[in-house]
Structures are given as structure tokens and as C-alpha cells.
């Protein structure tokens, strides 16, 4: 409603009255979208009449005919106050939502009240947190406070019904049907099952559950079981991994990871800000070039392939040391040292072209590499999901993301067969188009600077699963294209 370019084309405005809002004389300005089914709002703007024409307060409601997934009604209220230096800041925010799971069934109601106070703009000698560029970051101990602390520090005391909410939730969890729904939702979102009835006391979680059963051409039916320790066992040391077995190849695969977190964690190792040292040992089956960003390769829905069967595969045995450091200004540094043995499997062959023109079949090759990646996302909000910032459930994607990485192969180090240098750079941004939706744009480029065998060249990420995966080519087969340099563009338009 305040857009300087599209507002008057998208909304109709009506002056309703002149009112007093918390001591400020304001004009009550009503607005409605020209099209009642469009993604816009109806509501009121309260504009001060002191010559500054500042927004003192606004009310936003979704139109009656809007199609907004499971949301039936949404109302947002914000009120602002003027500071002594004439800066306007947010004072109160109320959000009301009516939503449903099944159309026509009993609706659910949610209300959130947020109050802001004690703004400080002239902090002297800012410490290492407030002196950085990042926005709001929640430290693990921020929510681990006693009831007494909140009684003395809340700007607005809780009402009696609000204070009883925790007791109500505890009673609801005793209802079997409700508890089953909550547990199922937690498993679907996190992918893990706690080993205690109270998740906050679990020392080990089983998962991810969507990787328990899968299948591929080489292994046939594949079974996998794994999990991870939590901060309830130790807030600095974390272990995770899995065991997997294929019915056809009858080989046991495994992954074991031990992580030391310099920062004390609330529940799992991936909580922001990350400052972790990890050691990884792994032996497993991979498809060349396939690297899904938002899920595991063993996800049962990703493992279900369509089209031409994927028969070219690899057994990879890997030992890796990794250090990852995340600063609150959006900069992340990742460095690693890796030794990897790559064995051809299925219909994949490694043939060496000798000087006399003959081909020699190689069962496997070994490479040792050092690598580093810089990731910079200025203004990015912290996300504490187990899968990290690339998680599908991380909806905070407005900040631009820039990445620069380089990998260097070291011949004759720990049996390595090749020298190589591989550089990649990328830029990603969500572009908002006002009422016309948004575009997720990603541009990447990479180059291998040395002469290397094809498994060490650049392979576009193919996707032959039944699901559409971001940043993957859905019409491409594994190893269909291999190159030593590339530029790729990914643009996804979400229309409204």
C-alpha cells in the first residue's frame, strides 16, 4: 500500500476520518485491492498530520476471496513510536491467523504479540556481537531462562490465559490422537525420532527416517539405519553416522562423523553460529555427478528413478577433516583435507589410454585434495535446522549469497594419482516483483585448470528421480555431459 510506483494502480484508497492514535493526530486512510482475489491486503493506514506524514499505525487484512493455502484469515497490526531524535521505531506488533487443515472442518486460531522497547542507537565500545553487520541472531542460551527471569524482563506481563498455555499444551500431549499428530509432524519436519518421550531430554536421535529404505541398480533394495547425538549428551562433542546394506551387492556401507563445536550448542551441531571441527570416515555408493542440495541421495523419493536406468555408479571410500567457521556478519569459511578412493561399479569403467595406444582398465584411482570455500550472505537471518542453510525448510532466502571455492589435488600424497586445480564461483538472489511474485536466480561458473581424467572433470547435476530438485537438470542422464569449464543459469519464477 505504500509503494511509490504500483500502489495507486493496485489499491483504491478512501479517507475515512481524523483520529487520535496514542497522542498523535492522524488521518485514517482505508485501502482495498482493485481485484479482491489478488495477493494484496485490505486495511487502514494511520498517517500523522504534523507535517511529517509518518505511518503511526497500520492494519492489514487478507481479502475475503484470496486463495492462501490453508490460511482462511490473516490480520497484522503494527504501531510505531517516535524517539527523541525523531526516529520512528516499531513499538507493537499483533498477528492473528485463522487456518484449517481440512476445508469446512474446525478452524485453528493463532495470535502472536510482539513488543519492542529500550532501543539503543549510541552503544559505546560495542562488543564482538553488536559490532558486526548481521541482523538478529539468537544465541543458544537466549531461550534457556527461568520463569522468574521473564517475569522481571517482559515489557508486557502475560495474561492469566497466556500463562496457562504451557499447561494446556502439556495436557494436550497426553491425548493419544493429538500426540500422534504432533509426533508425526515433528518427524516429517526434522526427519529424526528422539529416543525419549521428551525431545528436550533425548541424547540420541534416529534418522533421517526418509533414508531408511531405498533402491538402486547396483545394490537393489537398500536398508539404512543411522542417527546423531544431541547436546543433551554433550554440548560440544557430537557424533553422527549410518550403516547401510544392499541386497544385491551384499556390501556393508557406513558413514561416521565426529564433530567438536567450539560454541556451546542447545541441541545439535548445526546451530548458528557454527565453529566446528569434524572428522569423517565413509564408504558408500554414489552416482557420478549427482549432488542434491536439499536432501540426501538416499531419500526414498529421490532414489525412485524414472526413464533410462542409472547403471554407472561408484564405490567411494573417503577420509576427511573439515573446519567450518561462521561469523555473524554473514561470512562463512569452510576448509577441508580429503583422501578418496574411487572404484568404478555397475557399467562404469575406468580405462587409461597408454602411450602405445592400448587401453588399460583401472579398477580404481585415489586422489588427495585440499579445499576451501568462502560464503558471504550479507543480512542473512540465522537458521538452526539440522540440514543447515541449504535446508528446504529455510524460508529466509532474501539475502544475496556469494560463494567462491577452490580445490587442489596433491599427486603422490597418501597415494594420490593426480594434480589438479578446480575453481567455482556463484551468486544467488531472490528478486521480488511486488504483486507479480518473485524470481529465484542463481548464476554459477567453474573451471578445472589442469588435464585430468573424466571423473575429476565437472559433471552437471542430473536428476532422474520422480521429484523436481532445485539446481538440477531434470532431462539429463548421469555422465551425459562432462566438461572442464562451464557457466550455468537457474531461474525459477513463482507467480502470484
Residue ranges and their predicted role:
Residues 8, 53, 149-151:
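Hydrophobic transmembrane signal anchors and adjacent membrane-proximal interface regions, especially
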Residues 133-496:
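Exposed, low-structure sequence patches enriched in small/polar residues
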Residues 1-10:
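Active-site acidic/histidine clusters and adjacent loop/turn architecture
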Residues 11-17, 76, 90, 114-116, ...:
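Generic preference for hydrophobic/aromatic residues in regular secondary structure cores
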Residues 2, 30-32, 65, 463-469:
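Short, charged, low-hydrophobicity "junction" segments
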Residues 13-15, 20, 24-131:
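Gly/Pro-enriched, hydrophobic low-complexity segments
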Residues 2, 15-18, 78-80, 263-267, ...:
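Intrinsically disordered, low-complexity boundary segments flanking structured domains
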